[in-house]
Regions:
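Short aromatic-rich membrane-water interface segments that cap or initiate transmembrane helices
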Residues: 6-11, 79-94
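N-terminal signal-anchor/start-transfer transmembrane helix
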Residues: 17-37
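Transmembrane alpha-helix/helix-exit interface in multi-pass inner-membrane proteins
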Residues: 52-72
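Membrane-interface helix-boundary motifs at transmembrane edges
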Residues: 32-45, 115-119
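Hydrophobic, aromatic-rich membrane-embedded alpha-helical segments
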Residues: 124-148
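Hydrophobic alpha-helical transmembrane segments of multi-pass membrane proteins
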Residues: 14, 94-101, 129
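Membrane-interface interhelical connector segments
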Residues: 67-85
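Hydrophobic transmembrane alpha-helical segments in integral membrane proteins
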Residues: 2-23
Length: 157
């Protein structure tokens, strides 16, 4: 049975499941940000444990096929090295899982932080959707909205 699970979860299947798997979390964040569902499943550590498990599985799978992990450190040497790394599907999955996990973490943080300032949940839908698609711009958009509700700029919160 373990062999069947291992052979089922190809890189393409993992990619599909990661993309589909985070959609319920984002739906809860956007539509029900103040619900118990959001507190238990999304703004907690729960989704990050799931994505960490996927990350570890991809690393394990990479190790079994003899992936050269040392080449990952060459990405800091220049754009040509980075583009060479992106030719490998396993590296893309490692990167994509990392990207999805960080964006979901930022989305959860935005929801928790917006509740401290009682920001309208309809207004919060915009930066959350943008964070899902392009994380840093969604975070910037949230900070702009947050300034108006907090009535101050604080770089340390």
């Amino acid at each position: 049975m373990i062999e069947q699970i291992y052979t089922y979860f190809t890189i393409e299947i993992l990619y599909m499941w990661i993309n589909l798997g985070v959609l319920p979390f984002w739906f809860i964040l956007i539509v029900f940000p103040q619900s118990h569902l959001s507190r238990i499943f999304v703004t907690s550590i729960f989704p990050l444990f799931i994505l960490s498990g996927v990350y570890i599985f991809i690393l394990y799978k990479s190790y079994l096929i003899g992936y050269d992990f040392d080449s990952n450190f060459t990405l800091y040497l220049g754009l040509s090295e980075l583009s060479r790394l992106f030719e490998d599907h396993l590296y893309i999955m490692i990167f994509w899982t990392h990207f999805i996990a960080i964006n979901l973490f930022i989305g959860g943080w935005i929801v928790k932080d917006s509740q401290k300032f009682s920001i309208n949940k309809v207004l919060m839908a915009v930066p959350l959707i943008v964070t899902y698609l392009i994380g840093p711009i969604g975070l910037l958009l949230y900070w702009i909205i947050r300034i108006f509700y907090a009535k101050r700029i604080s770089l340390y919160e």
